[in-house]
A protein has these predicted regions:
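Helix-to-loop junctions at the C-terminal end of transmembrane segments
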Residues: 40-52, 235-247, 332
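Helix-loop-helix hairpin linking two adjacent transmembrane segments in secondary transporters
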Residues: 75-79, 107-164, 206
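Helix-breaking motifs and short loop linkers at transmembrane-helix boundaries and internal kinks
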Residues: 20, 52, 73-78, 107, ...
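Cytoplasmic helix-loop-helix junction between adjacent transmembrane helices
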Residues: 83-119
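A late C-terminal transmembrane helix in Major Facilitator Superfamily
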Residues: 303-338, 345
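Structural signature of the two symmetry-related core transmembrane helices
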Residues: 55-69, 250-265
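Extracytoplasmic gate region of multi-pass secondary transporters
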Residues: 8-9, 184-236
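Conserved MFS/SLC helix-loop-helix module at the cytosolic interface between two early adjacent transmembrane helices
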Residues: 39-78
Length: 370
């Protein structure tokens, strides 16, 4: 799923030169999929009424594969942006459906399985960042991007076999989507999730160009982004596994502190220990993602209802996060560098640390279950 997003950054200078896109326009290649992820997460309830979870995942993987293949068939700027929309649709549906499946089938190991799911997402992103520059050495840039249809097709075949006994998740109880729009707690979860993932979206879009601006080669900058995603995998596996009880705040604060140190390092000492800043930011982002999913799932006992809350959180969150790389691109066009963006995300992490205090377990029921 994630190579559709992470494969673009290491090729951005070549891509911009070939298509004439500005930094703001190039940012849409990351922003549009994230925005579509948000829209489809909000539409998840409507999708589930039309399709089973099994069919939703199958169609999602097909959309991701076609989005990647589109980049080979029509590699101009407009078609490139449309391919990002199609791939984002696929990613959005599958990310809305999987949390409910996880809670239904793995209730007692929910935090661990959510971490494994998140780690798989992020590991795929790291693969896209590391391998794409090397694919580009033997192929045109658009062919290098199109290669990422193959993992999506492989995942489709595996899911077709593995999901044969999966039934439709239903729950007569729990809030419907309309009431979630009137829930302050659901909005708080969405904003919280969005601010965290805004940092991720900006880093996958602009970390390689930032280091290429500092003199690095595309292959080295791609490896650095892959290192960040390796940190995400480690964080997604380690932090949820450490979860005890129902208070997620200590681990969320730990994840945010690592993000804070990573962004400060990118601002102050980018060339001294770049691998350390990338790893710290990655571990913090990777750990925070599944913890946010579990935090939302904790609010409601019914899997389908909890899945709707997670879908709402992801919908609002990804719509907010999708704006982040575009704002970053505008800041780059305005300032000529990326420091303003890293400074903005540093301030946002401090805000997130303050918001985390709102998520005491006692507040789950007081908030009306979402």
């Amino acid at each position: 799923m994630r190579p559709l997003l992470t494969s673009v950054g290491p090729l951005l200078p070549t891509l911009r030169q070939a298509t004439g896109l500005s930094f703001g326009g190039a940012a849409l290649l990351t922003a549009l999929p994230v925005l579509m992820m948000g829209l489809m997460a909000l539409a998840g309830g409507w999708v589930n009424r039309l399709l089973s979870e099994r069919a939703s995942v199958l169609l999602s993987l097909l959309a991701i594969a076609l989005g990647a293949l589109w980049r080979e068939l029509a590699p101009d700027s407009v078609q490139l942006l449309l391919s990002a929309v199609l791939g984002g649709l696929g990613i959005g549906v599958i990310q809305a459906v999987m949390p409910g499946i996880i809670k239904h089938h793995f209730l007692k190991r929910m935090a661990l399985v959510a971490g494994l799911w998140s780690a798989a997402l992020m590991g795929g992103g790291g693969l896209g960042a590391a391998v794409t520059p090397w694919l580009n050495r033997g192929h045109d840039w658009h062919s290098a991007l199109a290669w990422w249809a193959l993992p999506a097709l492989a995942a489709l075949v595996v899911w077709l076999w593995a999901s044969r006994g999966l039934g439709r998740l239903t729950s007569p109880a729990g809030r419907q989507a309309g009431s979630l729009f009137r829930s302050p707690r659901a909005w708080l979860l969405g904003i919280y999730f969005g601010l965290i993932n805004g940092g991720y979206a900006s880093l996958i879009a602009w970390l390689p160009p930032y280091y290429m601006q500092l003199g690095w080669q595309p292959q080295a900058s791609g490896v650095l982004l892959a290192l960040m995603t390796l940190g995400q995998v480690a964080g997604a596996l380690a932090l949820p596994a450490l979860a005890r009880g129902h208070d997620r705040r200590p681990l969320l604060w730990a994840a945010l502190i690592m993000q804070l140190v990573g962004f400060i390092g990118l601002i102050g000492w980018p060339l001294q220990t770049p691998w350390l800043w990338a790893l710290l930011a990655g571990v913090g982002l990777g750990g925070a993602f599944p913890l946010c999913l579990v935090l939302a799932l904790d609010h409601l006992p019914q899997p389908a209802a909890a899945g709707r809350l997670v879908a709402f959180m992801q919908g609002i969150g990804f719509l907010l996060a999708g704006v982040a790389p575009y704002i970053s691109g505008l800041l780059r066009d305005y300032s000529g560098g990326f420091l303003l963006d890293w400074q903005l995300h540093t301030l946002l992490v401090l805000l997130l640390m303050a918001l985390t205090a709102r998520f005491h377990p006692r507040s789950y029921r007081q908030s009306g279950g979402g």
